[in-house]
Design a protein with these regions (language model features):
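Beta-strand/loop-alpha-helix module characteristic of Rossmann-like adenine-cofactor folds
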Residues: 1-140
């Protein structure tokens, strides 16, 4: 089926510019907008990331590089793909603003084992400062 790579391209471009990325997980992973909608779970997000990773790796040679922005996006994607998806650091944020809120600092590989909550988001970390590292230790 069709797989969008734009979320992973944004993560790559942000990391290339040393920016963290907040990714809100879909409330309707089916995309149908009807029936019983179940929020995307952490393990679903990992499966989607793997599909995007593989498609981006296959399609990167075809990406346009006519403008500076397009060239930067390709360079950022190449840098991201030269690493390992499973070892990428990520923070799972679940049910923020409720009594059940939870933060878990983990990796993409370990994200599969996380239950998450009713509403989940992910923070993909770029380079972290000493203060940020100390904060992340609370959620490991």
């Amino acid at each position: 089926g069709w797989v969008a790579t734009s979320p992973l391209e944004v993560i790559a471009a942000n990391m290339h510019q040393n920016l963290h990325t907040l990714a809100l997980l879909d409330l309707d992973p089916t995309g149908e907008g009807i029936g019983h909608q179940i929020p995307l779970r952490p393990q679903d997000a990992v499966a989607s990331l793997r599909l995007m990773w593989d498609k981006l790796a296959d399609a990167i040679e075809e990406m346009p590089q006519e403008t500076a922005l397009q060239s930067m996006r390709v360079e950022a994607c190449e840098a991201l793909l030269s690493g390992d998806l499973d070892s990428m650091d990520v923070v799972l944020c679940s049910d923020m603003g409720t009594d059940d809120e939870s933060l878990v600092a983990t990796t993409v590989a370990q994200l599969e084992g996380q239950l998450g909550g009713r509403l989940n988001s992910l923070v993909f970390q770029s380079k972290t400062s000493e203060v940020e590292e100390k904060a992340l230790l609370r959620w490991r």
